Amino acid sequence: MQSKFIVIEGLDGAGKSTAISFVRKYLEKNNLAAIYTREPGGTKIAEELRNLVLHNKYDEEIHSDSELLMIYAGRVQHYRNLIAPALEKGINVVSDRFYWSSMAYQGGGRGVELSKIRALNDNFLNGCEPDLVIYLDIDPILGLQRAQKVGSPDRIEKAGLEFFNKTRKVFKDLVKDSDNAIEIDAAKSIQEVEKQIYLILDKHFNFQN
């Protein structure tokens, strides 16, 4: 079976980590090897860039274009050093976020032109597209409430409600325009989200469990 690149997307507080735990449980049950990773981050250098973007400790504003480029510098490291090699070896890759998050957060939220972001993906990631995107949709107010229960808000989580409304809109538009993305209502119970994820994976892997 050809290796798959599966990405979980969604706003902060949508439950991506929980969803990934369901994907892990499913793949392990079906004896499918996989690595589990995240963005921003995924490699040592990418994690350093993540920390700079989310927890800027310097008395210097990060421009929206700079934010995008720092995230993409980490993404290139992540893709070339971890994602692509794993897929080439026949190992499935499951990632908490990929380039859709830049389209939504930096494109929708920050207002960076989407064409710039697509160009980065085409030029530096060989136009890599996930085999499956599971988008967890949630109202930004509920998402931020959930996120704040986990810990102190990071730099992006402090961006405000309007930012997240714009971010959500781009996510939903991306799902509508994609043939390999499925939206799940993340406000539903954990049990219902788990059930939907298993059904999606059954169909994707052509399994009948």
From Swiss-Prot:
SUPFAM superfamilies: P-loop containing nucleoside triphosphate hydrolases
GO cellular component, one term: cytosol
EC number: 2.7.4.9
Binding site for ATP: 10-17
Keyword set includes Transmembrane: no
Coiled coil, from the record: none
Name this protein carries in UniProt: Thymidylate kinase
Organism ancestry: Bacteria, Pseudomonadati, Pseudomonadota, Gammaproteobacteria, Thiotrichales
Gene: tmk
